[in-house]
UniProtKB/Swiss-Prot annotation:
It is found in: Nucleus. It comes from the Eukaryota. This is mRNA-capping enzyme subunit beta. Heterodimer. The mRNA-capping enzyme is composed of two separate chains alpha and beta, respectively a mRNA guanylyltransferase and an mRNA 5'-triphosphate monophosphatase. It comes from Yarrowia lipolytica (strain CLIB 122 / E 150). Transmembrane segments: none annotated.
């Protein structure tokens, strides 16, 4: 059936049929009665509406198919909704416009800010995180560094058991030295594991088989000073040179040692504290001259009266203060001579991050502070010539 013929044919034989144009544009007064329709195949109003709709949807090329469908009254599957099932969009060419569903709402979460177990922290856009322009991983998140994550978990486990008062006295320091096998005699061999990269040593193994010596030759302490002096000076906030004398009174294990520190020249008391060791964790660095030990302790001011055996030592120390930690180069003299390099985390920042429960990234900041501390130790350790 030709729709154009239905609209434009002036032949009186078909003029009584209501045109498609009048159906679309006239007020909804209902479809013509059956008496006005010469087509005996369309036996009802709904049949005519369905027939006209089928013709509009299929076009001129489908006339025969539509006629057969109208005769057989078979259900029709539409490739797109018919006009009576779509929202009106206007007339003319706009009436045939495709009706597409609104685009899906994009996920507005920034994947770089997700705190996934496989990610370490928030990162800038992936296109700026690598010099190749490639994303840092298939997720766009840089995986955490395993040694630092292990140290962070270790620290979190201990800090979580402390009271708010104890947290205010926490000290975390890292020293370079050698992890040694516990053997008889003065000459103890450095730990030799079948690995080629640094790793945290199992705590049970350390307690049963190992000890740690933080003593360095004095020549290496001077070399470490040159390394620190040659580093970028803009990161050094200040330096300090002190000479102190410590009086150490060994107390019970649950109380720790009492230490009175005096100025070596004037004798003025600088500090009176009770220091108690909490835990240690050791990192074996097989390709570097020395290993690393991190020690967690509490140092609280006290007015206790000194008791017990006293030992003294003289400390000649040069300190470099950085944002987040301080580096100490110390020559110790007493019953024996020794030299030590240690870096101590900024306790105010460390505990401030840890206790800030309102910050969803507080442990990310703790981990980053530990990363900075360990990277600074690595920087010096890898430049020493043992």
């Amino acid at each position: 059936m030709d729709i154009g013929k239905m609209i434009n044919d002036d032949n009186g034989s078909d003029s009584r049929r209501t045109s498609v144009k009048s159906l679309l544009n006239s007020p909804p007064t209902g479809l013509p009665s059956s008496d006005d329709r010469p087509d005996s195949k369309a036996s009802s109003t709904s049949d005519l509406a369905q027939q006209l709709t089928n013709e509009m949807e299929s076009g001129e090329d489908d006339d025969d198919e539509d006629a057969a469908a109208a005769v057989n009254h078979k259900p029709r599957r539409y490739s797109r909704p018919p006009i009576w099932a779509t929202k009106w969009q206007g007339t003319g060419r706009h009436a045939e416009r495709d009706h597409r569903p609104p685009p899906h709402r994009q996920d507005r979460r920034d994947p770089r800010m997700e705190r996934q177990s496989g990610g370490s922290r928030a990162l800038p856009a992936s296109s700026t995180t690598t010099i190749t322009g490639c994303p840092p991983s298939i997720s766009g998140i840089k995986p955490f560094e395993s040694v630092t994550r292990t140290v962070t978990s270790w620290l979190h486990a201990h800090l979580s058991t402390m009271s708010p008062e104890q947290l205010q006295t926490v000290e975390l320091e890292a020293k370079i030295g050698t992890i040694q096998h516990k053997k008889a005699g003065a000459d103890r061999a450095r730990l030799d594991l079948p690995i080629v990269t640094e790793a945290v040593v199992n705590q049970q193994y350390v307690q049963a088989q190992c000890s740690f010596s933080s003593q360095l030759p004095e020549s290496l302490l001077e070399e470490a000073k040159r390394i620190l002096d040659a580093a970028d000076p803009k990161f050094i906030k200040s330096t300090e040179h002190t000479i102190h004398r410590d009086e150490i009174y060994e107390g019970q294990q649950d109380k720790g040692n009492l230490r009175i520190t005096r100025d070596d020249v004037t004798g003025r008391q600088v500090a009176k504290i009770r220091k108690k060791a909490i835990a240690h964790i050791m990192i074996h660095c097989p390709t570097d001259p020395f290993d690393i030990r991190l020690s967690l302790a509490t140092e609280s001011p006290t007015d206790d009266v000194p008791q017990g055996v006293c030992r003294t030592r003289r400390k000649d120390r040069i300190s470099y203060l950085y944002d987040g930690f301080r580096a100490d180069l110390t020559k110790v003299s007493g019953s024996s001579m020794s030299s030590e390099l240690e870096m101590e985390a900024d306790s105010h920042k460390l505990i401030g991050y840890f206790t800030d429960r309102n910050d969803p990234h507080n442990m990310d900041k703790v981990e980053e502070l530990l990363q900075i501390l360990l990277d600074s130790m690595r920087y010096v350790n890898r430049r020493l010539k043992a």
